[in-house]
A protein has these predicted regions:
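Aromatic- and Gly/Pro-rich donor/ligand-binding loops
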Residues: 4-15, 19-167
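Conserved small/polar residues in nucleotide/adenosyl-binding loops
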Residues: 171
Length: 172
């Protein structure tokens, strides 16, 4: 019997992602919907690396990923107490994730495997805030482009996370 495939940030170490994912799974259980959280990892290939190069010069990507990551690492290095608290927090996130998210797919490595495995789902659903942000909308995972036409695509509480999208990003 086919089931629903859920694309969610269940293992991201922030409260919003984990609580949204958990609330979604609780609601699916309440409605007796058979589901599993889809686990997908990009296969690093020369083509993927080549496609990623323009993103390194994208101001949104630079701000969202590079600058924020650098600032966080610098703060943790300069303030050892913050690093200790962060380690405790990350441990709590890991335990929450391990205890709450049991219905997981096998890990699908690479886009081709993700597309192939999507055939086992009646529907795929994306659920969490800001998964369609300009820096991530083109991933073809959270926008559900991997699923074929016969698979129902559902968005639950998904947003762009910005109030305006640049013209060059508006064609999705």
């Amino acid at each position: 019997m086919k089931k629903l495939g859920l694309c969610a940030c269940y293992n991201h170490k922030n409260y919003g992602s984990q609580l949204q994912s958990y609330a979604t799974t609780v609601e699916l259980k309440k409605r007796n919907i058979d589901y599993e959280i889809i686990r997908y990892k990009k296969k690093i290939t020369p083509l993927l690396l080549t496609k990623a190069i323009p993103r390194l010069f994208n101001p949104v990507f630079i701000n969202d990923r590079i600058i924020e990551t650098f600032q966080k690492k610098l703060m943790l290095k300069l303030h050892s107490q913050l690093a200790e608290q962060n380690a405790v927090r990350n441990d709590a996130f890991n335990k929450f994730s391990e205890n709450r998210f049991k219905k997981l797919s096998p890990i699908y490595y690479g886009y081709d495997e993700l597309k192939k495995q999507s055939e086992k789902y009646t529907a795929v659903m994306v659920g969490s805030d800001q998964l369609w942000s300009p820096s991530g909308i083109t991933s073809n995972f959270y926008n559900l482009m991997f699923a074929g036409d016969s698979c129902t695509k559902i968005s639950y509480a998904t947003s762009f996370g910005v109030s305006q999208i640049e013209d060059r990003k508006s064609v999705v």
